[in-house]
Regions:
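A generic local structural motif
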Residues: 10, 63, 120-123
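Residue-level recognition of short, solvent-exposed, well-ordered loop/turn junctions
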Residues: 17-18, 64, 127
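Short, compositionally biased
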Residues: 32-50
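Polyanion-binding loop/helix "lid" in catalytic or ligand-binding cores
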Residues: 47-89
């Protein structure tokens, strides 16, 4: 997807600040769940499998949402490498910030929960890529505006956590730290760290 942005209005990865809310659009982990299940177009798929495969084969980039977010969000990224990896890119670009994420706040895919179980669906939501939903940050005083945008657009926009000082992403589940096995896709050319 390509296009033009008015001068000075590009929404970039940098710009998040400590104390801001972290949001995601839609549900996460469906494309990764389709891969885990080995779904492809040659199979006769159930309704739930079809939902997952559609998200893998025909993702819908949130271009219109991104345009509107230029006036609300301070930083944004599409979730192509996995939530933890892509949020990490935003935090690094914004000055080595951190994040506190609540696992229970993540809108999990009902189809992935049903076919893989809730823990696997959570793992895919945190680390699976190719969803092309948006992850963005916004100051707490813009919560009402984000909620209004969600209602008017018909999209699910969920606050999943907060930007914190210091590096790293902490995910808590039931008040205790949740350990993710991996952080998401790492491009072969990326440096460690």
């Amino acid at each position: 997807v390509g296009g033009w942005v008015p001068s000075g209005q590009a929404l970039t990865r940098q710009g998040a600040s400590t104390g801001e809310d972290i949001y995601i659009s839609g549900t996460l982990g469906e494309a990764a769940a389709a891969l885990t299940l080995g779904l492809d177009c040659q199979q006769q798929l159930t309704l739930l499998e079809g939902e997952l495969f559609h998200r893998l084969a025909r993702p819908e980039p949130r271009v219109d949402l991104g345009i509107v977010l230029r006036t609300l969000a301070t930083a944004a990224i599409d979730i192509s490498d996995g939530l933890l990896a892509d949020l990490g890119h935003v935090l690094a670009a914004s000055g080595q910030l951190g994040a506190s994420i609540t696992a229970e706040a993540l809108p999990l895919s009902p189809a992935a929960c049903k076919l893989l179980g809730k823990e696997a669906a959570l793992s895919h939501a945190l680390t699976g890529g190719d969803d092309f939903e948006l992850c963005f940050t916004a100051p707490p005083e813009r919560r009402l505006a984000v909620a209004t945008l969600a209602r008017s657009s018909g999209l699910t926009l969920t606050c999943i956590g907060t930007v914190t000082p210091g590096g790293g992403v902490t995910v808590s589940q039931g008040g205790a730290p949740h350990v993710a096995v991996e952080s998401g896709y790492r491009h072969h050319w990326q440096a460690d760290g």
